[in-house]
């Protein structure tokens, strides 16, 4: 398999040069892309995020939860997710809080979950291996059988082979790692849990040998192999962004297939510019959008994030997780207290990952900044949103063939015959003609991200469709801006959702309305005097009694808006 998985022909078709909508010149050539449909195509398990917020709801205001977190999750509806969860000392209160979040998000989207309990505790000489694993299994038993969190499908022993403060500790203590994994496997079987082990959950090319070792020593108890990759040096547009992910995963896919297994890209991300981990007295774990807001780098690295996902898709990975869905909150201290609020905060600190008091972990699609009440989106929302929404689990991959080194392409078909295509253009604005071996049953909706003018939205709504394009015999042409990404899809239903009823101002100064009975409803948009003032999953909005003409519209899972 070749890097960039392409072979294409760039046709020098004689046609007049054109100008794109943004005023940039468009190449007079037409770049040809062919989507092939091999007899045997690999099954895709879905893109998703590390949903760190799933254990952090006690820290959220109602406004942040309903208007940003739940609203954005339901709009994207990821079909795969990774969560720091499954702790051996997880409290009933914290598990119930997680189960409530599960009901509000994962259950609605049918999201498959991969759990990992952050970092394992330090392995001491008297560590109780069997007791630890039994405690994990008992808690998962409660979540699966009592709370009915049945989409918990995978579990990894620890994040990136870490033990306590030592990242990668198990890479040099593999005998201990194996002993614990086998004890976990036995505990899950005793409890009748259909939860497969993901091993080794290691990271970086330096530790690929952990995966090789696991295939030789843990294949009998491993459900899926797992590896992480971060790019901290490449620049947007460099071929290495795609090629490094594609190359490493192609080799790992082959290795794991030889053991009758598949591999997951358990985390991926890109920071770039060789940024040091430490800045001043704190650790910097932020992406470009947080470090350099709305800079050219931040606007373009949002494309890189999706580009790395396409590399995983085309390399044959089972699924892939982008770190993270929402920013972590600002650092805070871990300490118990007497009030319910203090105890909830203590549980969040214990069960949400390592180093919450020293890290600025800002890698989300949108901000979590309580101090400044800033929950706005990063450019990443408008590349990753549709990648995760449209490239969902249960799809099969179409192999793209082309020869333009400035393009990146990915495509899938779904069991209902619908198809989604993603195209990245790192070159000058150009016309691309796509020929698909899979027929397009209806016009394709088009969603575009132009890094020169990202489609930012004050309420974190995904960008509306730019329009539709009609294919003839599986062929359509489109013009792509420079350094941009576009999605084309027949995975939609064209409809008008039922209107929202019962809109009125309550006596407490809040606007209220009736719950939508539409099974495809996702969230509400609220308008005053024709201007949108909020997006929310709630049926109440505090407008402080402000006078005006109010309207509430329902948005369904395909982005259709009611009247």
Tell where the protein language model's regions lie, with residue ranges.
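Short beta-strand elements bearing conserved aromatic residues within extracellular beta-rich modules
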Residues: 444, 524-526
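Carbohydrate-binding surface patches
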Residues: 402-442, 446-451, 483-487, 518-519, ...
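Pro/Thr/Ser/Gly-rich low-complexity, intrinsically disordered linker/stalk tracts
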Residues: 492-520, 557-563
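Substrate-binding cleft and catalytic face of glycoside hydrolase catalytic domains
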Residues: 71-236
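Beta-strand-rich modules
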Residues: 542-561
């Amino acid at each position: 398999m070749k890097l960039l998985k392409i072979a294409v022909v760039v046709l020098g078709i004689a046609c007049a040069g054109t100008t794109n909508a943004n005023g940039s010149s468009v190449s007079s050539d037409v770049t040809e892309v062919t989507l092939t449909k091999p007899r045997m195509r690999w099954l895709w398990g879905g893109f998703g995020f590390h949903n760190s917020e799933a254990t952090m709801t006690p820290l959220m205001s109602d406004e942040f939860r309903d208007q940003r977190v739940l609203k954005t999750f339901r709009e994207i509806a990821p079909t795969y997710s990774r969560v720091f969860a499954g702790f051996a000392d997880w409290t009933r209160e914290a598990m119930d809080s997680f189960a409530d979040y599960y009901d509000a998000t994962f259950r609605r989207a049918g999201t498959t979950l991969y759990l990992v309990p952050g970092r394992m505790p330090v392995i001491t000489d008297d560590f109780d291996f069997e007791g630890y694993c039994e405690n994990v299994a008992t808690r998962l038993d409660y979540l699966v059988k009592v709370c009915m969190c049945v989409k918990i499908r995978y579990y990894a022993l620890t994040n990136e082979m870490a033990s306590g403060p030592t990242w990668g500790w198990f890479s040099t203590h593999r005998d201990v790692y194996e002993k614990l994994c086998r004890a976990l496997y036995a505990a899950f079987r005793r409890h009748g849990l259909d939860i497969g082990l993901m091993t080794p959950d290691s990271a970086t090319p330096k530790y690929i040998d952990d995966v090789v070792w696991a295939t030789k020593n843990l294949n009998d108890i491993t459900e899926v192999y797992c590896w992480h990759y971060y790019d901290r040096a490449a620049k947007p547009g460099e071929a290495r962004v795609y090629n490094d992910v594609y190359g490493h995963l192609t080799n790992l896919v082959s290795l794991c297939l030889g053991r009758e297994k598949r591999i997951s890209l358990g985390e991926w991300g890109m920071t770039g510019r060789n940024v040091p981990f430490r800045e001043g007295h704190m650790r910097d774990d932020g992406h470009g959008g947080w470090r350099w807001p709305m800079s050219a780098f931040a606007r373009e690295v949002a494309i890189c994030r999706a580009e790395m996902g396409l590399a995983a898709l085309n390399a044959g990975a089972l699924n892939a997780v982008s770190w993270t869905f929402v920013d972590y909150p600002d650092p805070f201290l871990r300490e118990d207290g007497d009030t319910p609020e203090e105890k909830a905060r203590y549980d969040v600190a214990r069960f949400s990952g390592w180093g919450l008091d020293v890290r600025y972990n800002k890698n989300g699609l949108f901000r979590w900044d309580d101090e400044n009440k800033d929950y706005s989106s990063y450019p990443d929302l408008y590349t990753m949103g549709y990648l995760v929404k449209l490239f969902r689990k249960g799809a099969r991959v179409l192999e793209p063939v082309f020869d333009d080194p400035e393009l990146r392409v990915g495509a899938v078909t779904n069991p209902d015959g619908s198809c989604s295509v993603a195209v990245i253009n790192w070159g000058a604005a150009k016309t691309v003609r796509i020929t698909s071996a899979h027929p397009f049953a209806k016009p394709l909706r088009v969603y575009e991200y132009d890094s020169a003018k990202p489609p930012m939205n004050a309420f974190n709504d995904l960008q509306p469709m730019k329009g539709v394009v009609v294919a003839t015999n599986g062929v359509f042409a489109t013009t792509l801006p420079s350094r941009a990404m576009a999605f084309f899809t027949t995975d939609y239903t064209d409809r008008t959702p039922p209107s929202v009823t019962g809109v009125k101002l309550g006596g407490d100064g809040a606007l209220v309305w009736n719950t939508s009975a539409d099974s495809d409803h996702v969230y509400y948009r609220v308008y005053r005097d024709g201007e949108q003032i909020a997006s929310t999953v709630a049926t109440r909005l505090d407008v402080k009694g402000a006078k005006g003409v109010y309207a509430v519209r329902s948005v369904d899972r395909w982005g259709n808006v009611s009247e």
